[in-house]
């Protein structure tokens, strides 16, 4: 009986800690929004809807709302050339931001994108960005 109670309490505690971590990841939304406005909105627009045929939308983007943020982090670090989004081909180039922005700044931008325009993506930490930056 006590084992079940202890196990239940451990699960509840883990859930609470996870919720606090997620809430803290989105806590710098104003900073993320300011960075997004400065570095991203000219192409992806303030609305996150991009420009059809020129710059892909971030609103509702599979890259933004996936549980695994690796592709999103790599796109910001390394930039992108062309590709398809939502069945639309894009020939434009997204610049790399690895030399321009720090890990916390990239995490703030990604977290802003993950929590804006109706997106419900998983929060990203500066440590995750640093780990991706360190990978070849």
Where are each of the predicted segments found?
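Sec-dependent N-terminal signal peptides
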Residues: 7-16
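N-terminal signal peptide c-region/cleavage motif recognized by signal peptidases
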Residues: 17-22
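Periplasmic/extracellular electron-transfer cofactor-ligation site
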Residues: 28-70, 78-88, 115-123
């Amino acid at each position: 009986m006590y084992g079940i109670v202890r196990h239940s309490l451990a699960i509840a505690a883990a859930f609470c800690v996870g919720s606090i971590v997620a809430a803290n990841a989105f806590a710098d939304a104003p900073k993320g929004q300011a960075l997004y406005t400065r570095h991203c909105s000219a192409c992806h627009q303030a609305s996150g809807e991009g420009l059809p045929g020129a710059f892909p939308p971030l609103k509702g983007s599979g890259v933004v709302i996936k549980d695994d943020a690796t592709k999103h982090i790599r796109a910001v670090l390394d930039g992108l050339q062309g590709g398809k989004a939502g069945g639309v081909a894009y020939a434009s180039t997204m610049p790399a931001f690895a030399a321009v922005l720090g890990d916390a700044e990239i995490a703030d931008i990604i977290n802003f994108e993950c929590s804006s325009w109706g997106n419900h993506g998983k929060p990203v930490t500066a440590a995750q960005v640093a780990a991706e930056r360190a990978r070849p």
